[in-house]
């Protein structure tokens, strides 16, 4: 099924995924297209952060679903 991942810059990345794909696999696909390491990615769907060990089906993703990509940048202490 075809889903979209929307970045904070408004760019939309189209991905063809399987309902059994884990969120970690979706993050790997985003890395292939955008070069962002999965460890820095946070995927949000329906207002909730998606867990790496769950699959697309468990979040009720359908063709045309839009995920939001937020970057989790590691910072030092202030």
Curated annotation (Swiss-Prot):
One of its GO terms (biological process) is protein neddylation. GO terms for cellular component: cytoplasm; cytosol; nucleus; SCF ubiquitin ligase complex. InterPro entries: Nedd8-like (IPR038738), Ubiquitin-like_dom (IPR000626), Ubiquitin-like_domsf (IPR029071), Ubiquitin_CS (IPR019954), Ubiquitin_dom (IPR019956), Ubiquitin_ubiquitin-like (IPR050158). Gene3D superfamilies: Phosphatidylinositol 3-kinase Catalytic Subunit, Chain A, domain 1. It comes from the Eukaryota. GO terms for molecular function: protein tag activity; ubiquitin protein ligase binding. Keywords: Ubl conjugation pathway. Pfam families: ubiquitin. Belongs to the ubiquitin family. PANTHER family: UBIQUITIN. This is Ubiquitin-like protein 1. It comes from Schizosaccharomyces pombe (strain 972 / ATCC 24843) (Fission yeast).
């Amino acid at each position: 099924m075809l889903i979209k991942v929307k970045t904070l810059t408004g760019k939309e990345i189209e991905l063809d995924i399987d309902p059994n794909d884990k969120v970690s696999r979706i993050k790997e696909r985003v890395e292939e297209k955008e070069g962002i390491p999965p460890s820095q990615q946070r995927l949000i769907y329906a207002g909730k952060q998606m867990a790496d060990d769950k699959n697309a089906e468990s979040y009720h993703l359908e063709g045309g679903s839009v995920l939001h990509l937020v970057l989790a940048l590691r910072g030092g202490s202030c």
